[in-house]
A protein has these predicted regions:
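Alpha-helical support elements that line or immediately flank enzyme active sites
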Residues: 14-36, 136-153, 273-297
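Conserved phosphate/anionic-ligand binding catalytic regions in large, soluble enzymes, centered on
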Residues: 10-12, 16-21, 121-137, 239-264, ...
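A short glycine-rich, hydrophobically flanked beta-strand micro-motif that places a catalytic Asp/Glu
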Residues: 39-43, 172-178, 228-232, 298-309
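N-terminal, positively charged regions that mediate nucleic acid binding
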Residues: 1-42, 46, 380
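Short beta-strand elements
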Residues: 45, 108, 127-134, 174-197, ...
Length: 393
């Protein structure tokens, strides 16, 4: 008997309250890095109704108008309609950002462990980070999360073009359920789209549009069957959305940001954090390693885990799991990984070229699986696959 199960993943649109916060936090980070690549940034955002609160710790030489950066980020999302309670030009902004604690910076900037070179950068915090890859899609990502991202991205593309569906508004969510047989995705069983809309559009119009212009356009036709269920705005109405409808916080969509629940997550959010924070940089490195392992044909699925201690430059552990899909021994894969890659925070930053204002490109539709801008999203490259394959022999 074949092993059959259904796995679901969701994505959210740029106007979702939590994504609004991620967008603002990464916009502030990029503004800092544009002028000072060594900026230390931990920017958290809260939104509700017409209020934006930014809090956290920033140490930078950059000089810019925080309010304008925040308003520009909101404007880019699309909260500019006259009837928006949360409006780019009208929100009240509270800024309670302070400098990074000297107790943290001394461990990040210099040695923390005996015998380590003074120039070595320590990890910005303790914690564990995961990277994951599989051969289910061209992007070497799990199918459910990639399909959900495709739907969300297409909704936003159509909304911002402002031609085909002028009634679309920024807040949206998508969810895709995929049936697996013997570990392989074979069909889509259910698709859910909830999209904010103008008050005067009929539900039937929204339903027809989402099915014909979004779902059938974005998802593989061979995986949509006569039994695939489409649920469009299941409550029947979604006029009040965004921060008017719900509060938002930076870092509350970490599963959307990563692997849709198929690969594990260490718990640390990405947005608003500079690359000295291993929550972000080591998670990117984990993806880089796992993707190259799969691209090298060493395994069909690969998950990598790192763990760090604050101020200490070396990871305290490195773990690789291929879930029995490996084509060579796991010992060979682990040996190859540790030979080809360096997991010290400073080396991660150098290898992935992270001291640049690239992070706003990561905020929406997943930090992983974006292969159309490898100059910025460097952890999606597969340039180490050949070296891994050679080292694993």
């Amino acid at each position: 008997m074949p092993n059959s199960y259904i796995f679901s993943s969701e994505s959210v649109g740029e106007g979702h309250p939590d994504k609004v916060c991620d967008t603002i936090s990464d916009a502030v980070l990029d503004a800092c890095l544009t002028q000072d690549k060594y900026s230390r940034v931990a920017c958290e955002t809260l939104v509700k109704s017409n209020v934006v609160v930014v809090a956290g710790e920033i140490t930078t030489k950059a000089k810019f108008d925080y309010n304008e950066v925040i308003r520009a980020a909101i404007r880019g999302i699309g909260y500019t309609n006259n009837d928006d309670v949360f409006h780019a030009d009208k929100v009240f902004i509270m800024n309670i950002l302070t400098r990074q604690s000297p107790d943290i910076s001394q461990g990040v900037d210099a040695k923390a462990a005996e015998g380590k070179k003074k120039a070595e950068q320590g990890a910005g915090d303790q914690g564990l980070m995961f990277g994951y890859a599989c051969n289910e899609t061209e992007e070497l990502m799990p199918a459910p999360i990639m399909f959900a991202h495709r739907l969300g991205r297409e909704l936003t593309k159509i909304r911002k073009a402002d031609k085909l569906a002028k009634w679309l508004r920024p807040d949206a969510k998508s969810q895709v359920s995929v049936r697996y047989v013997d570990g392989k995705p074979v069909e889509i069983t259910n698709v859910v789209i909830s999209t904010q809309h103008a008050y005067d559009v009929k539900h039937s119009t929204i339903e027809e549009f989402c099915i014909n212009q979004v779902i059938k356009k974005c998802l593989p036709p061979k995986m949509l069957t006569k039994d695939t269920e489409f649920l469009i705005n299941p409550t029947g109405r979604f006029v009040v959305g965004g921060p008017e409808g719900d509060s938002g916080l930076t870092g509350r969509k970490i599963i959307v940001d990563s692997y849709g629940g198929m690969g594990r997550h260490g718990g640390g959010a990405f947005s608003g954090k500079d690359p000295s924070k291993v929550d972000r940089s080591a998670a990117y490195m984990g993806r880089y390693v796992a993707k190259n392992v799969v691209a090298a044909g060493l395994a069909d699925r690969c998950e990598v885990q790192f763990a760090y201690a604050i101020g200490y430059p070396d990871p305290v552990s490195v773990h690789v799991d291929t879930f029995g899909t490996n084509t060579v021994s796991e010992e060979s894969i682990i040996a190859a990984v540790t030979k080809v890659f360096n997991f010290k925070p400073a080396e991660i930053v150098k290898q992935l070229n992270l001291l640049r204002p690239i992070f706003s490109k990561t905020t929406n539709y997943g930090h992983f699986g974006k292969i159309d801008d490898l100059n910025s999203i460097t952890w999606e490259k597969t340039d180490k696959a050949a070296a891994l394959k050679k080292a694993a022999k």
